[in-house]
């Protein structure tokens, strides 16, 4: 079983994972992420309906959490969180913890100006994805590799479509039995982290 989790079918994420595994930024020490948009003017939206499983964490928390888990190959542990609720659903959540040896800090919001970014900060460099989740819609998909002595290498992915790639990967898996890039077990791990954040998060005024 698998989940239709499109970002892992995008070459920018496949490349980011490979670069981290190859030691391009040294030892990963800290991960930061953010994903926000504002749908406050649409009260009937399912994301604004507590009874229908609304809230930012269930909608976009899967991306700031799942993407980091994909790159690091580790689960979020030692979790702490702060949550702002509105009519029973979260409109802002900040979360902290550890993924392997790295610390982790991220936020999601459905009441803030649109923004998305993921950063992997290592002992020998920094990897930044500028449009990590809505590639070529929010902005051009690209990876910035910041290196010593103000070195900067940028890899661009202007033509990639992760939805097309996802369908092709699914078809390839069906035809050949090849592993699908995001299993049900991986999806469950992200959902367990979200459930923990919702359960232990401290309410913000």
Predicted regions and their residues:
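Predominantly a Rossmann-like dinucleotide-binding segment in NAD(P)-dependent oxidoreductases
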Residues: 7-79
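A general structural signal for well-ordered alpha-helical segments in protein cores
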Residues: 13, 64-65, 137-140, 163-168, ...
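A short glycine-threonine-serine/GTX helix/turn-capping micro-motif
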Residues: 52-58, 153-161
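Contiguous beta-strand/loop segments that form the cofactor/metal-binding neighborhood of enzyme cores
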Residues: 65-136, 157, 167-178
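Short polybasic amphipathic segments
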Residues: 118, 137-148
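C-terminal helix-rich "cap/oligomerization" subdomain common to oxidoreductases
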Residues: 169-205
């Amino acid at each position: 079983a698998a989940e239709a989790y499109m970002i892992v079918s995008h070459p920018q994420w496949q490349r980011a994972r490979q670069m981290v595994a190859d030691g391009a930024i040294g030892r990963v020490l800290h991960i930061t992420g953010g994903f926000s948009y504002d749908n406050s003017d649409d009260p009937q939206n399912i994301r604004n309906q507590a009874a229908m499983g609304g809230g930012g964490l269930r909608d976009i928390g899967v991306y700031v959490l799942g993407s980091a888990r994909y790159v690091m190959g580790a689960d979020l542990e030692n979790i702490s969180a702060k949550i702002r609720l509105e009519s029973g659903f979260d409109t802002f959540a900040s979360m902290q913890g550890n993924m392997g040896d790295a610390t982790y800090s991220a936020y999601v919001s459905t009441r803030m100006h649109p923004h998305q970014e993921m950063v992997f900060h290592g002992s020998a460099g920094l990897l930044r994805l500028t449009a990590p989740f809505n590639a070529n819609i929010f902005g051009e998909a690209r990876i910035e590799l910041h290196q010593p002595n103000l070195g900067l290498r940028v890899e661009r992915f202007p033509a990639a479509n992760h939805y097309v790639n996802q369908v092709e990967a699914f078809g390839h898996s069906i035809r050949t039995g090849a592993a699908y890039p995001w299993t049900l077990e991986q999806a469950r791990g992200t959902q367990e982290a979200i459930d923990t954040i919702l359960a232990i998060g401290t309410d913000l005024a």
